[in-house]
Amino acid sequence: VTASQPTLQRARGRARVGFKRRGDQTVLADLHQSGCAKLRLPRRSKDAPGEAVIINTSGGLTDGDHFDVTAHWAEGARATVTTQAAERVYRSRGGDARIDNRLEVAANAAALWLPQETILFDGGRFQRTLKIDLADVAAHLLACESIVFGRGAMGETVHAGHVFDRWRVRVAGELVFADGFELSDDQDIPQLQLDRPAVAEGARAIATAIVIAPAMHWLGATCAWG
C-alpha cells in the first residue's frame, strides 16, 4: 500500500503599500499586511524619498506557498520598495510556489522596485509574475529582479527544479515590455541548461532590469530620484 503525502500547512502572505506627495515630502498613504508578509518603514530624513521593506516571516517558499505584494505611487511620490533579505525557494514535493507582484505608478511619480535576489535551491519550484502599470510617459520606473541558482560558495548545484518568471509593463494602458523566462527539469538538468550560450553561458545568476523615464532625463537633466 502506497501512503499518500500528508497535507501540510502552506504559507500565505499579502502586503499592500502606497505612497503619496504631501508638500515637498513623500508620505505613507496606504498599508496592509497579512499572513507571513510584513512591511517595515525605515526612519529617514524629511527630504528623503519614501521606503518600504518587505519581510517574509516564513523564511522561504515551497510548493503551495503564495506571496502577494501590491505597491502604489500617487502623483509626485518618490519611494523605494525593497526586501529585508533574499527570498529562498526550497525543495518542492511537486507543486510550485507563487509570487505575484503588482506596481502602479502615477504621473510624475518615481518608483524604485529593488528586491534582493531570489535563491533557488535544488528541487525548488516557483512561478513569479510582475505586473507594472505606469499612468503615462511622465512616470518614472526603475525595477530589477534577480535569480540565483544555488549558493555557489556553499558548493550547491541545482539538478532539479522549475522557474517561470513573467514581466508585463504597461504605460498609459499600452503594453511596452513583455518578457518570460522558464527553466524546467522537464527539458534537462537546470545546471546544464544554464551552461548553454543562449541561456546563461555558464552563469549561475540572472537578472532583469528595466528603466522607464521621460527622454529629457537622458539628455543630462536630473532624474526624479536624484
PLM features per residue range, with description:
Residues 1-117, 122:
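N-terminal, charged/glycine-rich beta-strand/loop interface patches
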Residues 15, 67-69, 99-101, 109, ...:
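One face of beta-strands
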Residues 18, 53, 70-72, 102-104, ...:
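Residue-level recognition of well-ordered beta-strand positions that form the cores
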Residues 18-22, 74, 106, 133-135, ...:
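Solvent-exposed residues in well-ordered beta-strands and their adjoining turns
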Residues 77, 139, 165:
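Short beta-strand/loop motifs in extracellular/secreted proteins, especially
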Residues 95-159:
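Internal, conserved structured core segments that host functional sites
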Residues 147-226:
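A structural signal for small-residue-enriched, beta-sheet-centric alpha/beta enzyme cores
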